[in-house]
Amino acid sequence: KKERYILKKIWDIEKPIATIITLYPSTSDLIINDSTTTFITNNVFKCGFGGFYSVNLYSKISTGKREFGKQDTKVNDNYILKCAKISDNIIIACGSLPKTNKLVQNRLNSIIELLAKNKLRKKILFLTDSNKQDNFHPLAPKVRAKWEFM
């Protein structure tokens, strides 16, 4: 398996569902979780959600060097949009990489524009800490135990 578009974990359909947008997929699946998926699951549950769709700016599964510029993103965009439309909130959790990598910054901006074009802007939240200054990735020590949003 070279790409993953969605990882879906739903435990209570009566509660709100979130779409979490991170950078790229891990090797997690429905049963085996990596650290990122574990922190997402724990915090989504603590925030009162009934589950989540994990989607990524890039769909290629890779444990080595990231090749952000060499991926076709059209299919992935459709999956992101599909999940966003059926979710109560869209949580952007890409961390600081968009600040330091122009390709990633442009990709994130294009996803935000896509969501805005589809009238989903009001659903967007950014994962942050109590200072509400920066966007964090779920692995960041400051947000591992408690999520805040801006």
Q: What residues fall within each predicted segment?
A:
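Residues at the starts of beta-strands that form the adenosine-phosphate
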Residues: I17, G50-G51, N89, K123
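Short connector loops at secondary-structure junctions
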Residues: G50-R66
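A short, flexible beta-alpha/helix-coil linker loop
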Residues: Y24-T27, K60, L97
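Glycine/proline-rich loop-helix segments at beta-alpha junctions forming the active-site rim
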Residues: S62, F68-M150
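Active-site and ligand/interface coordination hotspots across diverse enzymes
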Residues: K1-D34
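A short mixed-secondary-structure module that forms the rim of ligand-binding clefts
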Residues: S26-G48
